[in-house]
């Protein structure tokens, strides 16, 4: 008879704690489900992809092949104490064929944005004299007018010109010269002076 009493109280008090446990587990499962089902990590990944796409579009916003920037280096060797001459920067720059006969002919417009003029001394310690130099930003003079700036032939030196000083802010037609540097030595014709080393940075646009 004891077994009959146990089975007869299923709706009484014997099975009821198990129901409460199951109900409690369901409530806990329901509380956990929002955390499991909300996949918030997917949204930041989509935003990162969009930012990455924006960065790529900025890098490719300017079409390639429409402009170029180049650096050229050339030298003027075997200068004597009384040597004189000039560098005309543009299509007349015969001392730098790679620029004059090369890339300059491939573009309609250019501008030289900086010029580094270096004098490398090769003179003996007993030599005397200097080499004066002058910037003509508009190619208006053909001979040295000023002797203010000088390189001592026994020491050497360097001078840098930026774009605003050399008429290099605006674009120039590739058939026109931009500026000129003139120089003249006051030493002896028998004395070895040295050489010039010139570095120019050039921007080009509108290819032919």
Swiss-Prot record:
Residues annotated as transmembrane: none
- Where is the protein localized? Virion
Example GO molecular function: structural molecule activity
* Chain intervals with Basic residues compositional bias: 17-30, 44-61
Name the InterPro entries for this protein.
Luteo_coat, Viral_coat
* Major location category of this protein: virion
Which residues fall in a compositionally biased region of kind Low complexity? 1-16
Q: Which UniProt keywords apply?
A: Capsid protein, T=3 icosahedral capsid protein, Virion
Q: Which GO terms describe its cellular component?
A: T=3 icosahedral viral capsid
Query: Where is region (Disordered) located?
Result: 1-69
The task this protein performs is described as: Major capsid protein that self-assembles to form an icosahedral capsid with a T=3 symmetry, about 23 nm in diameter, and consisting of 180 capsid proteins monomers. Most of the 180 monomers are the major capsid protein, but a small percentage contain the minor capsid protein, which has a long C-terminal extension.
Q: What is known of its domains?
A: The N-terminus like those of many plant virus capsid proteins is highly basic. These regions may be involved in protein-RNA interaction.
Similarity annotation: Belongs to the luteoviruses capsid protein family.
Q: What is this protein called?
A: Major capsid protein
């Amino acid at each position: 008879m004891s077994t009959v009493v146990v089975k007869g109280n299923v709706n009484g008090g014997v099975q009821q704690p198990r129901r409460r446990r199951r109900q409690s587990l369901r409530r806990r499962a329901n509380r956990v489900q929002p955390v499991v089902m909300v996949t918030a990590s997917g949204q930041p990944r989509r935003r990162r992809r969009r930012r990455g796409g924006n960065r790529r579009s900025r890098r490719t916003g300017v079409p390639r092949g429409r402009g170029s920037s180049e650096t050229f280096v050339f030298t003027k060797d075997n200068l004597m104490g009384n040597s004189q001459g000039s560098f005309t920067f543009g299509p007349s720059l015969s001392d730098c064929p790679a620029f004059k006969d090369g890339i300059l002919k491939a573009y309609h417009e250019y501008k030289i944005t900086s010029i580094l003029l270096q004098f490398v001394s090769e003179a003996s310690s007993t030599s005397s004299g200097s080499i004066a130099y002058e910037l003509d930003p508009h190619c208006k003079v053909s001979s040295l007018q000023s002797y203010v700036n000088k390189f001592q032939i026994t020491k050497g030196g360097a001078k840098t010109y930026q774009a605003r000083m050399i008429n290099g802010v605006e674009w120039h037609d590739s058939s026109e010269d931009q500026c000129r540097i003139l120089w003249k030595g006051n030493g002896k014709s028998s004395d070895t002076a040295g050489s010039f080393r010139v570095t120019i940075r050039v921007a080009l646009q509108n290819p032919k």
